[in-house]
Design a protein with these regions (language model features):
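Hydrophobic membrane-insertion alpha-helices, especially the h-region
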Residues: 5-23
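Terminal leader/tail segments of proteins
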Residues: 15, 24-32, 36, 129-132
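Short linear motifs in intrinsically disordered
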Residues: 21-27, 66-72
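Short beta-strand segments
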Residues: 30-64, 78-82, 88-92
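Short, structured beta-strand-loop surface elements
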Residues: 44, 67-134
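Short helix-to-loop capping/linker segments positioned immediately adjacent to catalytic or ligand/cofactor-binding
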Residues: 21-24, 37, 115-117
Length: 135
């Protein structure tokens, strides 16, 4: 009984440590942008994400199972706050660019990206190109 309780405490502590490590890695690894996505009723939610530039566009990446990803697929117009400026964009899923975008994310965010790759299948993430809608 004591062994089971100790094992449970160890597992729960390890999970908590992993969650905290991923949060710290995601927030401290470099630039974090704020994206406001909207539902069909116009209500917005803000999500903090990593961003990279590739060619003439900014890219985000996400998992199709995440809530913010589902919102931007249904309502692709978003607002992105980056470097103190807010701009409007249309989100365009760009699966064909998974490899170069993942490489850029890894270069830019280093250890933080590696930690996240441990718990996520990076073959599932979808790069999202941001097309400017103007001011």
């Amino acid at each position: 009984m004591r062994f089971a309780a100790g094992l449970l405490i160890f597992v729960m502590g390890s999970l908590l440590f992993a969650v905290i490590a991923i949060f710290v890695a995601s927030e401290m690894s470099g630039e974090v942008v704020r994206m406001r996505s909207f539902d069909a009723n116009g209500r917005h939610e803000e999500t903090r994400l990593w961003a990279v530039d590739y060619g003439d566009h900014t890219y985000l990446r996400g998992r199709p199972a995440s809530g913010w990803y589902r919102r931007v697929v249904l309502v692709p117009e978003v607002e992105l706050e980056r470097g103190g400026e807010v701009q409007r964009f249309r989100v365009v899923p760009s699966k064909h660019l998974r490899e170069p975008i993942n490489e850029l994310m890894s270069e830019k965010y280093g250890l933080g990206d590696q930690l996240i790759a441990v718990i996520r299948d990076m073959n599932e993430v979808v790069p999202l190109r941001l097309d400017s809608l103007g001011p």
